[in-house]
């Protein structure tokens, strides 16, 4: 985490809104456990519709600025009220996103929630394995460089079994084999104006999409070789 993220977490961690079903997840929550990269934003998930009438005024009283999400228009077209599904704020230059887990695979994962608390506060942080599975789901749904890097670290640290990853990929993308997974990764394209991945806040060196992709493919190849030996 950046020092800015830590400062913002300290500002929000004891807010009354976190007495509801809200859980700290995403790349920053993952880095809290495995220290794999520098993370710059805060993601909060709820298995239920967001209580926006509580969240918005409390965040604004803290000095946070509410910003519009790029999916707002499509949510309205689908007959949904956007603030019930996603809320984004900027506080001290740190993005904070609250979102409702409205996809069936997310809902199923969050039926059995395990969590601890962040720094003994009101802010609940999901169990590492559940954070990682939500990250794997995100990896299959978008082409963000940080999702690709996090996916590689989940493989490297064996947080989610390769079999469980293939179960998720089969449900989302009909990918059920190592070969199909490799093709899926090879076909991934770098998003324009995507966020960067770096490992040290003090001496920052951004990793490229291509080098991260190559590293992830090597990790999958290593897993395949280990399976062949057993």
What are these regions (language model features)?
Residues 1-230:
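Compositionally biased terminal segments of proteins
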């Amino acid at each position: 985490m950046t020092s800015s993220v830590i400062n913002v977490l300290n500002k929000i961690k004891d807010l009354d809104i976190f007495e509801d079903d809200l859980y700290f997840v995403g790349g920053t929550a993952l880095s809290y456990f495995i220290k794999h990269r520098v993370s710059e934003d805060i993601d909060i998930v709820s298995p239920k519709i967001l209580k926006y009438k509580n969240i918005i005024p409390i965040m604004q009283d803290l000095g946070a600025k509410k910003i519009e999400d790029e999916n707002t228009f499509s949510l309205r077209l689908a007959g949904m009220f956007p603030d019930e599904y996603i809320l984004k704020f900027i506080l001290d230059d740190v993005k904070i996103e609250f979102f409702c887990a409205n996809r069936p695979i997310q809902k199923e994962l969050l039926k059995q929630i395990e969590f601890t608390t962040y720094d003994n506060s009101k802010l609940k942080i999901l169990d590492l394995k559940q954070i990682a599975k939500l990250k794997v789901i995100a990896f299959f749904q978008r082409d963000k460089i940080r999702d690709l890097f996090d996916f590689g670290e989940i493989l490297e640290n064996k947080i989610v079994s390769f079999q469980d990853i293939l179960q998720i990929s089969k449900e989302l993308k009909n990918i059920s084999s190592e070969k199909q997974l490799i093709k899926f990764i090879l076909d991934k394209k770098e998003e324009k104006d995507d966020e960067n991945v770096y490992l040290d806040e003090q001496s920052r060196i951004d990793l490229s999409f291509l080098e991260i992709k190559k590293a992830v493919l090597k990790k999958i190849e290593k897993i395949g070789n280990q399976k062949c030996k057993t």
